[in-house]
């Protein structure tokens, strides 16, 4: 079989093989029973319950069944049981099944946002404003709409599609090598829906695994379906309906919590779901006869959320299976007979992950009332006709489209093309709330003594204002740094990488002035700035942008407190600028890979101090290197300006242990080196926890007005510090302690990103 065979060819061969294999591939319940009667044995049904991570125990039980030589005639599985049971029914070998479970990247699967390296550069910039990736989304009528789930379903759907694509053409799951069915729950009526006829294996798994609140409901034939555990977590009756005479039931459901543990809203909500599940499980247990075998692994130490303990849970399942071995041997078949059955079960299944697909054409499935042109979706996917792509590469393309934030999920299918090629059909499911969104962000910083600062940011965006994807953003920030921004981002075409962005902004902030004789501030100024500009730029895919701008700026600085403050300064002038922003970091606050390069310059013929024109230029580069759990980080920055005090050093973010804004000047040189380790395994938190040390070197001085407004002149200053940080759902939280030589020691608490 050529390497480029398509899913359609595989499915056709599977169906042909199923029709030839006779008893091993019986379909209807009557055919199942007749085949078993012909062999003089009872029909064996395997029932696998739901239970989240506890469902990994099913793999261990299956290992024991294979060792004993038990032939399985039908499989019914719920939730996690549908994934394990469906994969086994489709032809996964035991090793493939185990490797699949052990190889899942659960951080990615359950991540609240796409990989940052795939996100559009505008969304990357939001990270530096401490804005969350999602917020309160609004319908076209202005009605607030909460998300359908806490976790995007994108990774789950891609995972299921990748693992089951060899049988995409099979729409009757009784025609799999082992007949299979999975219960789901109709979210509107509350009734059980049996996923077997007129559905793919992927659709059945997706519906049965749609945990309410965690994943969005599955859409099937116009209905909303959620986790089958709500109505039939241990589908014994379903297995009998499929033809089973004897049922091997594996129950891994979470038991009800004791009174002492119901002390918070999370525990109470979980108990409510478990109550519904427990009621239908008790009913199913009552349907077991003396011939049936119930296996209940000892999982008291594990919860449904222990997804990273799969190897341990599989072992518990195997242990429980061995305890039931004596009863299971009654159902065992001769080794030769079982081996022939297992070969027939697995021989037509070809894992699709590494199969290469030559792309003939890229299409977008039709969608009603879509506001996003198909050309834009295809351009974002970056799949070129004639290219050869693996499933992993096609998954990455779907993730790139999803990362724009306008879709509930983006999947795809491979239709047969001419001469063994594949037609990639993208299947984006657009959000109902892509019209506008509101997000709230902020930052907090304190030294537990004299200095505390807090900023609160409100941001509203109108999305997709025209077919080219325009966006109007407005931001208001209050706190230590008061700011207003309004900008209109307009791409210059559906697929062109060019854009234009007019904007206006106002900013006001106070800062201290230090003299040359000591560490105490001698004055406090308030600086205000108004800026209006038009930016013309070139987008570099997900990497960033380069652009030029023209605008008008008004700056004013006046004294608030202090003795003998410098004269008031005011400056107004038109200017032109250049901008470069390249960012592939995986995380802003705790990066482990990628890089960031920013450069910005502005020049004007007008001057402040009567010394020619006004020029400001700054470049910053940050590069992390990682090995296992360790990460080294290097950052460097250089600034040059004709404006005195344009750059500052000092505080928790620059030169830990020195006062905020301790040094300022028209020249800046700064570097830091950090070494950090992920210590999550030692902490009782789900969020990543980091501990690190760093050393900083920097200096800032004036070359315009002399050194009268900055202490230390051109001297280099050194700081050493240590920190512990948590990358939490509400943003980075960090505790830092450090010392700047010759200045002092400081302890700081920080929440949110701070430059």
Pin down the residues of each PLM region.
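Bacterial N-terminal signal peptides
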Residues: 11-20
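Bacterial N-terminal signal peptides that target proteins for export
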Residues: 1-11
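Acidic/histidine-enriched alpha-helical segments
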Residues: 257-259, 329-347, 552-553, 594-597, ...
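Solvent-exposed coil/turn segments that connect beta secondary-structure elements
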Residues: 93, 102, 185-188, 198-200, ...
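C-terminal outer-membrane beta-barrel translocator/porin domains of Gram-negative envelope proteins
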Residues: 423-425, 435-447, 563-566, 573-697, ...
